[in-house]
Amino acid sequence: MTKKYDLHCHSTASDGVLTPTELVQRAHEQGVNVLALCDHDTVMGIDEAKIEANKLGIELINGVEISTNWEGRGIHIVRLNFDKTHPKMTALLAEQKSLREKRAVEIGHKLEKAGVPNAYEGAKALANGEVTRAHYARYLVQIGKVSNDGQAFKRYLGGGKSCFVKAEWVDIPTAIDTIHAAGGVAVIAHPMRYNMTGKWIRRLIVDFKQWGGDGMEVADSGQTKDQRQYLARLANEYDLAASLGSDFHFPCGWIELGKNLFLPEEVKPIWTLFE
């Protein structure tokens, strides 16, 4: 039987809406055999997810999505199959947590000035872990300032808007070195979602490969066939393994755990590096 993989999804440990237990249950309902919980800059949900995965016969891979800075842009690096208790890993995640908290507080202050009372407290009440922009968006919907999350980003939280705070994250080489020290593999998350031209995507991949990166996401739930083939060609051209993941955050019509996730035959699957 061919295994069904989803190596990128989120829970309430970061900005997802399902608990780790609920997420694993939904993955099981969707026929997923191998799952990686990749919350933003935290591994706090993995132990809970693993308990449910063991009950349901799902193989759970340790994962985390690390926020990094590259050429003035925010780039996400997915870490897979690592020792989450490794000292270098725990130190980096502690640093990221501090940076994320600092940013969250600054966003709260800006929202207060923009006429949103108790913004930080309201967002924190919706968060199970670190406060993210997604939690602020949900709070803005809750109090009636906007009608949906997208409007919250367009009006307040998106890049260049009045309450946007630029993040200060680690650089990519530091992220990769920490991943390797903990025995894992480093993967560029969703390369097509950074609003970059093909030239800039190649520059990112070249730097990532030069710094020791292992793979890139080639398949996700919402892409076109042409996008998948394009990313597969880049993975082969730069000798990177190919990963796949829905980047599931909440139930919706267009993104689902395990949905439309398969790799073109010509690529090297990332799980071949797990042994």
Which residues fall in each region the model found?
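Short clusters of hydrophobic/aromatic residues that line enzyme substrate/ligand-binding pockets
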Residues: 257
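A short acidic, helix-capping loop that chelates divalent metal ions and anchors anionic groups
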Residues: 88, 253-254
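An N-terminally biased module of ancient metal coordination in phosphate/nucleic-acid-related enzymes
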Residues: 1-73, 156-158, 171-253, 262, ...
